[in-house]
Amino acid sequence: MAQSLMTFRSGQSPLALILTTCAVLSSPAGGAWAGSAAFHQTETLQGITFHVQSSGEGSQQQLSITASGGKGPFTPVRQVVNGRVVGVRVADLNGNGQPEVYVFVQGAGSGSYGELVAYAVSNSSALLPISLQELSGPMAQGYQGHDQFEVVESCLARRFPIYKAGDTNAKATGGVRQICYKLRQGEAGWILRPTSVLNF
């Protein structure tokens, strides 16, 4: 399963990224589901406005993504996610003049595993799902969660600690791995594929 979590902001270079937390808590703001709004954020890019809201308690939340503008109306996205929403970014990673929305979900438990929920605007009137290529091979060695994500120029950057044998969950000693993903057209839709890896 594609996995993702929190966020970090870019500095002058990928190696100078400053870690931050972009969790946004808000009071109830209404929505499609009952219950308090655990997260509510609005972002606009290229004439499209995205409203992202989650609600619910426990290990699962109900996520709602609505979009307006363009040629709409857009069909709202509503789904259950395993964990809590901690961040949202909008970008145009493929440079086609139509934005994407990236929602980061942090899973429960000590590993803080999570998932990425992402959609791309198509023909200014529809939202198409984006998948994140699964970690495998050398990129997955030493991976035990604790991801951080951010948009850096035309790249979705993913950073996580590298664990060595014998490391505890609270202390990874293998450094940090950073993967740059580019948005590509796949056979069944849009997919984020890794294009570069840095260990430091």
Predicted regions and their residues:
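Beta-strand C-termini and the immediately following turn/loop, strongest in propeller blades
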Residues: S54-G56, F104-G107
